[in-house]
Amino acid sequence: MVMPLRDAAEDVGRVIREGLLHPVFQPILDFRAQAYLGFEALIRGPASSPLHRPDQLFAAARSTGLADALEHACREASLRAFARLGLPGRLFLNVTPGCLLDDRLLNGETCRLLNDLGIAANRVVIELTENQQITDLPGMHEGLLHFRRRGFQIAIDDLGEGFANLRMWSEVRPEFVKIDKHFIHGIADDRMKYHFVRAM
């Protein structure tokens, strides 16, 4: 469903202002330890709205200049829900590379919220998503260094999906990678895929 631009801006703005975001948590399992490694925070908009689906919610936010504000609101809602539910392990938070230098991330606001919620920074993993082109590599490094110094860890989503993604992996050197499903499907019978994944 395509929404008129003005309606989209009003609807996304209302979702942000009124706290109408609903985090859901996808478990990440550690098979060796037979325990939860953590949970990835995913977001949904209001159930009765076209913005319930995250692809439509974020597309509307991007088209109306509200993408950074929405991403910030998603992080806050996810952190609060994670603490309220008392979930074990790490929290994987999706962050676009362009938002790494967002003042609300760098000025200590996120760390203060973590402190208020009783969540240690070393339980939070910043998961870089590649849904936008990286135009400021030095800036991205600066942002990552800022968070690593405070105890956060870094993950990359869908490693192997494209050349830019592989470059990001070599530049960022993340603590965690999520490997694109192409390299996992049939890995038991494909030595090339097996060695690629082992090399990660």
Regions found by a protein language model. Give the residues of each.
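Active-site core of bacterial EAL-family cyclic-dinucleotide phosphodiesterase domains
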Residues: M3-A60
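Aromatic/hydrophobic pocket-lining residues that form π-stacking "cages" and hydrophobic walls in ligand
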Residues: L57, S78, T110, A199-M200
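Short acidic-capped amphipathic helix/loop micro-motif used as an active-site/signal-coupling element
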Residues: A47-L51, R75, L79, D158
